[in-house]
Amino acid sequence: MHRDLHMMSDRSEDDGDTSILTATKPKTKRPPLYKVLLLNDDFTPMEFVVHVLERFFGLNHAQAFEIMLTVHKKGVAVVGVFSHEIAETKVAQVMDFARRHQHPLQCTMEKEE
């Protein structure tokens, strides 16, 4: 038995084996992204919403004004798309800032599909 194993290990490299080894990279799955949404209410001043969009989302005045109008007319608008951690932070910042200024502004996040 020992002899058979030894003979198998001495096989010549040119034995007709045509298998090819290929290195495959494991596919890294991208982390899911989350939409940050601003919701309309009847009490938060439009100017405050524009200020929030400029301050926490880095939008210029014209961009912030457009999104504020969308929120006002449609009831909701996507403000941005971020990783989970960043989206969560932005929602918390907006909600905290609105509460400190006694506005009922709502900001939420949802997984992008």
Curated annotation (Swiss-Prot):
InterPro entries: ClpS (IPR022935), ClpS_core (IPR003769), Ribosomal_bL12_C/ClpS-like (IPR014719)
Taxonomic source organism: Roseobacter denitrificans (strain ATCC 33942 / OCh 114)
Role noted for this protein: Involved in the modulation of the specificity of the ClpAP-mediated ATP-dependent protein degradation.
Subunit structure: Binds to the N-terminal domain of the chaperone ClpA.
One GO-annotated biological process of the protein: protein catabolic process
Protein name: ATP-dependent Clp protease adapter protein ClpS
NCBIfam families reported in the protein's UniProt record: PRK00033.1-2 (NF000669), PRK00033.1-5 (NF000672)
Family: Belongs to the ClpS family.
Pfam family name, one: ClpS
Basic and acidic residues bias: start-end ranges: 1-11
Region (Disordered): 1-25
Annotated PANTHER family: ATP-DEPENDENT CLP PROTEASE ADAPTER PROTEIN CLPS, ATP-DEPENDENT CLP PROTEASE ADAPTER PROTEIN CLPS1, CHLOROPLASTIC
